[in-house]
From Swiss-Prot:
Lineage of origin: Bacteria, Pseudomonadati, Spirochaetota, Spirochaetia, Leptospirales
UniProt-listed Gene3D superfamilies: Ribosomal protein L10e/L16
Organism listed in the record: Leptospira interrogans serogroup Icterohaemorrhagiae serovar Lai (strain 56601)
Database matches in NCBIfam families: rplP_bact
One of the protein's GO biological processes: translation
PROSITE patterns: RIBOSOMAL_L16_1, RIBOSOMAL_L16_2
Ranges annotated as biased composition (Basic residues): 1-17
Function of the molecule: Binds 23S rRNA and is also seen to make contacts with the A and possibly P site tRNAs.
Coiled-coil regions, chain positions: none
GO cellular component, one term: cytosolic large ribosomal subunit
Region listing for Disordered, in residue ranges: 1-24
Entry protein name: Large ribosomal subunit protein uL16
Keywords tagged on the record: Ribonucleoprotein, Ribosomal protein, RNA-binding, rRNA-binding, tRNA-binding
């Protein structure tokens, strides 16, 4: 699963996801992409589950790019622990997603297969997504 090798700070405050994503909002590497329509938090497990689903559909053909990475640690206190006594230890990693962000990109396969694979992958994610094609600019 995806996680950073080293981080500057072990723990982070929650914050909010406001606005849309300007960076990473266009299909750059592949021909087809999966774009976030709503904001949310994707765990490393969810990203991995979507990746496996896409690879199962595509089999050996095509190439896949994962355009997101879980940088943010989520902490959790142990079970049956009283309140207080500081913040819990990092439990897992998430990627904070805003609307407009491209999550996955694909190339080397036909549009129908790409659409089916990305559609099945979208069921594994807790946010609404849409299928996009590379713009002819």
């Amino acid at each position: 699963m995806l996680s950073p090798k080293r981080v500057k700070f072990r723990k982070r405050q929650r914050g909010r996801l406001k606005g849309t994503d300007e960076r990473g909002s266009s299909v750059s590497f592949g021909e087809f992409g999966l774009k976030a329509v709503t904001s949310g938090r994707l765990t490393a497990r969810q990203i991995e589950a979507a990746r496996i689903t896409i690879n199962r559909q595509v089999k050996r053909g095509g190439k896949l790019w994962i355009r997101i990475f879980p940088h943010t640690p989520i902490t959790k206190k142990p079970a049956e622990t009283r309140m207080g006594k500081g913040k819990g230890n990092p439990e897992f990693w998430i990627a904070e997603i805003r609307p407009g962000r491209i999550l996955f990109e694909m190339s080397g396969i036909d549009e129908e297969t790409a659409k089916k694979a990305l559609s099945l992958a979208s069921y594994k994610l807790p946010i609404h997504t849409e299928f996009v094609k590379r713009s002819a600019l």
